[in-house]
Amino acid sequence: MTKAIGIDLGTTYSCVGVWQNDRVEIIANDQGNRTTPSYVAFTDTERLIGDSAKNQVAMNPHNTVFDAKRLIGRKFADAEVQSDIKHFPFTVFDKGGKPYIRVQYRGEDKEFSPEEISSMILTKMKEVAESYLGGTVTSAVVTVPAYFNDSQRQATKDAGTISGLNVLRIINEPTAAAIAYGLDKKTVGERNVLIFDLGGGTFDVSLLTIEEGIFEVKATAGDTHLGGEDFDNRLVNHFVQEFKRKHKKDLSSNPRALRRLRTACERAKRTLSSAAQTTIEIDSLFEGVDFYTSLTRARFEELCQDLFRSTLEPVEKVLRDAKIDKAAVHEIVLVGGSTRIPRIVKLVSDFFNGKEPNKSINPDEAVAYGAAVQAAILTGDTSEKTQDLLLLDVSPLSLGIETAGGVMTPLIKRNTTVPTKKSEIFSTYSDNQPGVLIQVYEGERARTKDNNLLGKFELAGIPPAPRGVPQIEVTFDIDANGILNVSASDKTTGKSNRITITNDKGRLSKEEIERMVNEAEKYKAEDEEATARITSRNALESYAYNLRNSLTDEKLADKFDAADKKKLEDAVNSTISWLDNSQEASKEEYEEHQKELEAVANPIMQKLYAGAGGAPGGAPGGFPGGAPGGFPGGAPAGEDGPSVEEVD
């Protein structure tokens, strides 16, 4: 029997999944990517769909079609269609009241409806699934935004039919995401679920209630023009300016240079979700000039901070419209690749008073995941296992934390059946250590460096005590879905922190780990030097931006003495501009600048805080020893002061 698939037909990217071997598989395309750009291109010789279409857009802008989802099921006269058309490089014209797209294909003019373009993308996703499954696929569940009206839904269904698919059902994207997390199975009674979906081109917030498997959309809000591409634009503009400053040339008139820069910016943005800094290197970007630069997470967040903040308005609107207090939201689900950005996760979590959102399924895959589950249910292909059995029967590798000296201390031994839970008590390694860094590893080797790091987090605010006195309870908890929760709490203060780690793709195979360990030995010395440099750069940058924020903070701005304020502003601005022009300075140079800036800032800040009961100190510490840095907002520790793991 042929399988039914689930397709997330997105504005910028699409994704396909299938229920197989009692779990959902998200299927990679021929380029090895688990999401495929929703792009179709027409050339003199061929039609391209997906990655190949997106990759040649700079050379062929007028015949590369994207964002068809913004046109599907709408009238040409629709105000939104009119405003979108202004920004499209391809031609959209009125045909019988509907928007049609005109391109050149093999030397002649062709006209396509948005349904036809979407059907080409669906065909591509169908083929991706077929080459993986080794057979024909005829049925699919396709998702649409919750706010899509009947004509947009019908048009999407038609696109499916054109692509040769029997569309079993059109379901709402937020509903699919909730199904992916099995939220419809969690408990009895009504649950309020907020879905925060920040994709490549659009931002949607939905509030659903789920009761006994029935989903009801209570309210939706969002911004149809806010997404990852806007963050890329900010980076592109930033680097166009930097290129102007450094090389006195304006590359914005050259579409190919812009496209290459945009691709590099998109890659850098993705890297900064897991790293604190990244480099951009583009050979011969414009007029033969090589462009080498770097970008820190702090800078990226500053460039986009107004966009990031604006995501909370629709959240408030949805709660108002549904007449629900934020405390009554049972579950928050993050969807869309842009919710990988740590700052966004933090904004959402802080808005809900520290409540942790569900993000254990890859956010750009959650919708396709839920659609695949739904497709399996509709075709009765759940082979007597329900969704509760997306489970890992045993934990395949030991799981533990790093203790002093880089030792692997396992809490859950390999081949333990799951679900399971295990706790142990640990303590500090040095006197008066105010924080511990919990690093979670999987593997069988005695030293953590030979194992695979799954994630880490900091537990700060431990009261001063001799080494070995504080009691820190670390708990490992694996649920039936193979999702690992690790928490640490200080027995004295009750302070706690946690991390969720999912078991799925992205884990390394043993061979890869071995190979990486061997390579890492070689590069270790270079890495350490680079790490020290980056750390001191980040510390300085973080410090400078925090001072700048203090200067503009409404609560503090009027408390500064005017002369002091001017002096501090000049020092901060000169430091930031030096940083911009000194990507490759040495650790010592960064530290020297840090000292100079502290010499100006400390007396001024002390004066300011004298009335407020003392300056907040940087939270020092680190379990096996954190990297130097400084909690944003704290005064960094001096040379001999303790160091701290940088925490965002």
Curated annotation (Swiss-Prot):
Top-rank taxon, per record: Eukaryota
Glycosyltransferase listed as a keyword: no
Molecular-function annotations in GO: ATP binding; ATP-dependent protein folding chaperone
UniProt-annotated stretches for the region Disordered: 609-648
Ranges in coiled-coil conformation: none
UniProt-annotated location(s): Cytoplasm
CDD domains named among the record's database cross-references: ASKHA_NBD_HSP70_HSPA1
Predominant location category: cytoplasm
A Pfam family it matches: HSP70
Key words, A-Z: ATP-binding, Chaperone, Cytoplasm, Nucleotide-binding, Stress response
Biased composition (Gly residues): 611-636
InterPro entries: ATPase_NBD (IPR043129), Heat_shock_70_CS (IPR018181), HSP70_C_sf (IPR029048), HSP70_peptide-bd_sf (IPR029047), Hsp_70_fam (IPR013126)
Gene Ontology cellular component annotations, sorted alphabetically: cytoplasm
Family label: Belongs to the heat shock protein 70 family.
NCBIfam families in alphabetical order: PRK00290.1
Name used for this protein in its record: Heat shock protein HSS1
Origin species: Puccinia graminis
Gene behind the chain: HSS1
